[in-house]
Amino acid sequence: MNKFSSDSSRTTAQSTINKLLVNLIPGSQLNDAKVAKKAKKSSSAKIISDQIGSRMEFKRNEEKRRKFLKQNNLKKRKMKRKSKDLEAQLERIARLSNIKELQQMSEDSNDPLLDQVIDKKITALLSWTTDNSELGTEIEKLKKDILNTDNEEVRRRKSYRDEEREEAEFRSEVEKGSIAYPGLTPGLAPVGLSDDEDDEEEDESDGFDKEEEEDQFSE
């Protein structure tokens, strides 16, 4: 079979053959037209099929791209949230790490509010857990470092200060008359005579004795 060098040469050859066939065989031109029409339909169907295939391929690629972007954004949000959580927990460690300083301040002062702050911080430290293994190690070290540092002495001094505070509050309530105490009248001195009253009675007694002596001498 001969091959044509180009489409134009092929078209020219087909046109020449068609003319010869028209002259030699009547009706051949109609058959050629049908063949051409059929070929055109086949070509159009192929073009449509190719277009549909391209669209489907584009749609699949677009879905893959959207899925990738969604997963990537989700991963970024998780990393950002994890970073914020880590930062927050590190800040919390920094806040709780000053418990030792507060304990020293508490030993040097009798501030009940400071004791309450220390108690809250220790409670928060004891109840703190995390899924981060590195942070968990730091937290455990912080617990041991703070809770095992002269805690017995700290508790003893705190108990002593609590007793002093309770005693001072009790005395204040007695002086106000809010609490009755054996031997005491609310708001007054103990039952009996005060030192001033004793002195006054002694002075009065001395006066009576002197008057009796003067009466005796006058008689």
Curated annotation (Swiss-Prot):
Keywords of this entry: Nucleus, Transcription, Transcription regulation
Answer yes or no on keyword Zinc-finger.
no
Q: Where would you find this protein in the cell?
A: Nucleus, Nucleolus
Supply the InterPro entries for this chain: Rrt14 (IPR031404)
The protein's predominant localisation is nucleus
Acidic residues bias located where?
Answer: 194-219
Q: Where is the composition biased (Basic and acidic residues)?
A: 153-176
Chain segments carrying region Disordered: 153-219
Mind telling me which Pfam families this protein's record contains? RRT14 (PF17075)
What is a single cellular component term in the Gene Ontology annotation?
nucleolus
Looking at the keywords, is Ribosomal protein present?
Answer: no
Task: Please report which protein family the annotation says this sequence is part of.
Answer: Belongs to the RRT14 family.
Q: Briefly state the protein's biological role.
A: Involved in ribosome biogenesis, probably through modulation of rDNA transcription.
Q: What is this protein called?
A: Regulator of rDNA transcription 14
Source organism of the structure: Komagataella phaffii (strain GS115 / ATCC 20864) (Yeast)
